[in-house]
Amino acid sequence: LIERDEVAVELSRGLVQALGLEDKITIKKTDFLVYFEDASDYDAVILASLLFTSGDTEELISHLVKNIKFKNCLVRTVRGMRQLLYKKVDEKLLEKYLKPELLVDPQNHILNSILLYSHV
């Protein structure tokens, strides 16, 4: 987990510890744009939907693709009337850097769709 907010980092550390996942999840407090690959290969990167509310979304995605080794990327989005509740991600921007693989739309009471992309 890469997070720049100290409060979010501390909450995340507490959650990871409570779940007993310290050996599986690493938390780094830093700004993502100054974070460079640490030689790890990641199976998946999960992009927080708040990323798409910032003005530097493209810069962040470009940095991710150029500097982090990963196979897949999961993104939460919304479609249709659900956009009244949440911001839809810019899929065209994502497709500029990543290859779309799968879209899972909600069933029953689930609000969000999940997009799966692969690293090109």
Question: Where are each of the predicted segments found?
Answer:
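Conserved SAM-binding loop
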Residues: 12-13
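Short conserved loop adjoining the S-adenosyl-L-methionine
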Residues: 34-39, 54
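Conserved SAM/SAH-binding beta-strand->alpha-helix loop
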Residues: 5-7
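Conserved hydrophobic residues forming the short capping helix/wall of the S-adenosyl-L-methionine
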Residues: 16
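Conserved SAM-binding motif I beta-strand of class I
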Residues: 1-3
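Conserved SAM-binding strand-loop segment of SAM-dependent methyltransferases
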Residues: 21-32
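C-terminal substrate-binding/active-site "lid" region of AdoMet-derived donor-dependent transferases
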Residues: 57-111, 118
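A short SAM/SAH-binding and catalytic strip from SAM-dependent methyltransferases
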Residues: 42-57
